[in-house]
Amino acid sequence: MKVLWAALVVTLLAGCQADVEPEPEVQLGNEWAKWQAGQPWEQALGRFWNYLRWVQTLSDQVQEELLSTQATQELTALMEETMKEVKTYKAQLEQQLGPTAQETQARVSKELQAAQARLGADMEDVRNRLVQYRSELQAMMGQSTEELRGRLNSHLRKLRKRLLRDAEDLQKRLAVYQAGIREGAERSVNTLRERLRPLVEQAATVRSLISKPLQERAEAWGQRLRGRLEKVGTQAGDRLDEVREQVQEVRAKVEEQANQMRLQAEAFHARLKSWFEPLVQDMQQKWAELVEKVQLAVGTSPTSESSEKQ
């Protein structure tokens, strides 16, 4: 495959055979240059186109490849790759189309299928021409093949022009299809926006209507709560004053009772003193008399003893 692509590059640089009209080939080559940087299916079609240009050179290497089945296999692989990329791109566009009108989607899909079928038929025709040329070339081995080359070259040139025309038609239809998708998406977005706008405005109105009573209720509830807190504070202050007064009353009563108890104790002490004081005085007097008697007795006793001894 690398050898084929190297030969392709050399062929593109060298140009076509002398029996091919140069000016139309240059124009077609310029037309196909833009396909190299497009969508994946366009790039695949460009590779098919370049392979066809290489086959059209009818060089000795190409004749050897055509006598084998490799050229047909390569061409078949490029055809399948191109049609696969076309189907993939078409499926992506259909997926992007979304909820577009079914009638429009069916019509556009039908047009794309027709253009896709024409492109596939053109590539199939190219492959059949190459198979026919290989059969005729094998039958004419050793004979002059100039007439066969000229006929194949003419057919391939016409097929390339038709292939370019059908490819451009498919490209235009896909572009229209994609533009329709964008317009449909924009219309859907605008329609959705128009439908949602009244709902958004209504929601804003309802929110404002709901928020006002809620705010009023919150303010009323806050006022009631403040009133209750103030009432509780006032009641607590009054209760504290009552408790303070009760404490003062209890303190006064306790002090009064303490004074009464002190007075009673003093009175009782006075009564006890009045009771026992005469007794104490009498006992003290008797005790003094007893002491005096003892002293007198003790004082007279030594005097009598001393007189007896003398």
Curated annotation (Swiss-Prot):
What post-translational events are described? Answer: APOE exists as multiple glycosylated and sialylated glycoforms within cells and in plasma. The extent of glycosylation and sialylation are tissue and context specific.
- The signal peptide here is 1-18
What the entry lists under InterPro entries is as follows: ApoA_E (IPR000074), Apolipoprotein_A1/A4/E (IPR050163)
Respond yes or no to whether keyword RNA-binding is given for this record.
no
Alphabetized, the UniProt keywords read:
Chylomicron, Endosome, Extracellular matrix, Glycoprotein, HDL, Heparin-binding, Lipid transport, Lipid-binding, Oxidation, Phosphoprotein, Repeat, Secreted, Signal, Transport, VLDL
State any single GO MF term. Answer: phosphatidylcholine-sterol O-acyltransferase activator activity
Q: What GO CC annotations are associated with the protein? A: chylomicron; extracellular exosome; high-density lipoprotein particle; low-density lipoprotein particle; multivesicular body, internal vesicle; very-low-density lipoprotein particle
Positions carrying Phosphoserine: 144
The record's subcellular location field reads: Secreted; Secreted, Extracellular space; Secreted, Extracellular space, Extracellular matrix; Extracellular vesicle
The record ties this protein, via SUPFAM superfamilies, to: Apolipoprotein A-I
Checking Gene3D superfamilies in the record gives: Apolipoprotein
- According to the record, the residues making up region (Specificity for association with VLDL) are 271-283
Its main subcellular localisation, reduced to a broad class, is secreted
Q: Where is this region: Lipid-binding and lipoprotein association?
A: 203-283
Cite the binding residues for heparin: 159-162, 222-229
sequence repeat segments: 77-98, 99-120, 121-142, 143-164, 165-186, 187-204, 205-226, 227-248
Q: Where is this region: 8 X 22 AA approximate tandem repeats?
A: 77-248
Region Homooligomerization, as annotated, extends over 259-310
Q: Tell me the segments the record calls region LDL and other lipoprotein receptors binding.
A: 155-165
Q: What does this protein do?
A: APOE is an apolipoprotein, a protein associating with lipid particles, that mainly functions in lipoprotein-mediated lipid transport between organs via the plasma and interstitial fluids. APOE is a core component of plasma lipoproteins and is involved in their production, conversion and clearance. Apolipoproteins are amphipathic molecules that interact both with lipids of the lipoprotein particle core and the aqueous environment of the plasma.
Stated family: Belongs to the apolipoprotein A1/A4/E family.
Oligomeric form and interacting partners: Homotetramer. May interact with ABCA1; functionally associated with ABCA1 in the biogenesis of HDLs. May interact with APP/A4 amyloid-beta peptide; the interaction is extremely stable in vitro but its physiological significance is unclear. May interact with MAPT. May interact with MAP2. In the cerebrospinal fluid, interacts with secreted SORL1. Interacts with PMEL; this allows the loading of PMEL luminal fragment on ILVs to induce fibril nucleation.
What name goes with this protein?
Answer: Apolipoprotein E
| Natural source organism | Tapirus terrestris (Lowland tapir)
